[in-house]
């Protein structure tokens, strides 16, 4: 964002009677959102939620199957 010293305006501060006034806010909020996603570096790729790269040659655009683990224990029998 080019105006780093300027605080982010509060949501809804625009003039509700002039819808065109909201356009500037949309740009400001979109820039702030993008900077948050990229860690403040415009043009850099977003941070990955995973800390490692998966190997295995699967197609990354397809969802991976979920793996489940279910454990059961029989109740203790008193004798």
UniProtKB/Swiss-Prot annotation:
Keywords: Phosphoprotein. Residues 31-68 are annotated as: Disordered. Coiled coil: none annotated. The record marks 12-13 as: Cleavage. PANTHER family: PROTEIN NOI4, RPM1-INTERACTING PROTEIN 4 (RIN4) FAMILY PROTEIN. Belongs to the RIN4 family. This is Protein NOI4. It comes from Arabidopsis thaliana.
């Amino acid at each position: 964002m080019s105006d780093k010293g300027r605080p982010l305006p509060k949501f809804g501060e625009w003039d509700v009677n002039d819808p065109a006034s909201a356009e500037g806010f949309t740009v400001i909020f979109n820039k702030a959102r993008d900077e948050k996603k990229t860690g403040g570096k415009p043009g850099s790729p977003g941070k990955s939620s995973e800390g490692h790269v998966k190997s295995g040659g699967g197609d990354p655009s397809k969802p991976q199957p979920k793996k489940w683990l279910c454990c059961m224990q029989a109740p203790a029998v008193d004798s």
